[in-house]
């Protein structure tokens, strides 16, 4: 049996960085993920298997999110307690999906089983959860809307319900693809960039669309169709990250031009970039934490429409602020080089 000290050392070794985590994320989410990763490593389970389990669990919570309601209840009898229970089950499933999403990376670092497909799957996991969950919530809102109609004095007619349902569906697509998708894409990229500036970074990866395109072009003729599909989507994913951050791209290009590689920059410059970046990372408008907490809150109070509004407006404005602040310090440092 490993000692407590050696287990703690292994836990820290399984993390890319500890400074970017909140207390709850580090001591609950990540530590739980580490013990699962340690156990999975003993059983020789591949990190990609954990990622796929995370996808199944997260997407599987959709039915419970769609069916849970304390105000309307569940089924013909309108069982309110069952409606509450479904919401709690859905939140629990999403929590464990997120734990497993952390576990796969920790397992990859513990076992050394890293792959390009694993990185792509890990990036896709959140989308695989949220697309069905958001569509399920849109259906729930369409089915149960009398409370909102009552607030605004709208007659609950089939025509009004259809118009409302279509409007909610449009908001769902915006919130999901522009809000959730766009925000997480920016957050993932800024996290990887920050780790480049961090001395404690462990296994940092910063993929470029150019590198990914080259890897795609070098795929063998008999490569699996799903691998081609994932890689093509990942090329578009990284290309969008780069288009969203033009001043960061200029900074990275300048660092490569001056020092040959970002990793060769002087320690004083690395520390400066790190100190600029860390407060922005801690804002966490683009991360999963605010989104998960708001989702739990709005489904429990039976107002899932609030999730789409919160994500589109509050987190959307927070993300724009994050990008503006990050781009400003990149421009400043580039001028000084």
Roles of regions detected by a PLM:
Residues 138, 154-194, 200:
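Alpha-helical transmembrane segments
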Residues 47-55, 122-130, 280-289:
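Select subsegments of transmembrane alpha-helices in polytopic membrane proteins
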Residues 47-117, 130-134, 165-179:
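Membrane-embedded alpha-helical segments that form the functional core of polytopic membrane enzymes
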Residues 76-77, 145-160:
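Membrane-interfacial helical/loop segments at transmembrane boundaries in membrane proteins
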Residues 29-43:
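A short amphipathic helical element positioned immediately N-terminal to and/or at the very start
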Residues 1-32, 179, 189-337:
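C-terminal membrane-associated helical module and adjoining short loops/tails
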Residues 58, 62-66, 133, 137-140, ...:
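Structural signal for membrane-spanning alpha-helices in multi-pass inner-membrane proteins
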Residues 35, 102, 106, 110, ...:
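Membrane-spanning helices that line or support transport/gating and their immediate boundary helices
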């Amino acid at each position: 049996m490993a000692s407590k000290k050696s287990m703690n050392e292994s836990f820290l070794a399984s993390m890319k960085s500890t400074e970017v985590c909140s207390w709850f994320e580090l001591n609950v989410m990540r530590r739980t993920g580490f013990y699962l990763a340690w156990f999975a490593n003993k059983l020789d389970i591949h990190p990609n298997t954990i990622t796929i389990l995370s996808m199944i669990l997260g997407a599987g919570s959709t039915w419970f999110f769609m069916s849970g309601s304390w105000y309307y209840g569940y089924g013909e009898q309108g069982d309110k307690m069952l409606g509450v229970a479904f919401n709690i089950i859905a939140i629990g499933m999403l929590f464990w999906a997120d734990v497993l999403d952390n576990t796969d990376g920790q397992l990859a670092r513990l076992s050394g089983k890293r792959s390009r497909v694993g990185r792509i799957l890990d990036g896709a996991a959140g989308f695989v959860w949220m697309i069905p969950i958001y569509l399920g919530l849109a259906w729930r809102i369409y089915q149960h809307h009398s409370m909102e109609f009552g607030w605004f004095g709208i007659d609950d007619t089939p025509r009004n319900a259809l118009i409302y349902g279509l409007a909610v569906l449009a908001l769902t697509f915006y919130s999901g693809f522009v809000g959730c998708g766009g925000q997480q894409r920016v957050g993932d990229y800024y996290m990887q960039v920050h780790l480049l500036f961090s001395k404690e970074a462990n296994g940092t990866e910063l993929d470029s669309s150019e590198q990914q395109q080259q890897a795609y072009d070098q795929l063998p003729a008999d490569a699996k169709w799903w691998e081609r599909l994932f890689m093509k989507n990942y090329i578009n994913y990284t290309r969008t990250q780069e288009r969203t951050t033009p001043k960061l791209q200029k900074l990275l290009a300048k660092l490569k031009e001056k020092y040959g590689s970002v990793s060769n920059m002087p320690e004083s410059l690395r520390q400066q970039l790190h100190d600029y970046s860390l407060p922005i990372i801690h804002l966490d408008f683009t991360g999963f934490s605010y989104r998960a907490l708001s989702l739990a809150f709005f489904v429990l109070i039976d107002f899932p429409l609030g999730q789409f509004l919160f994500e589109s407006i509050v987190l959307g404005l927070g993300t724009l602020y994050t990008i503006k602040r990050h781009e400003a310090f990149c421009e400043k440092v580039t001028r000084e080089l």
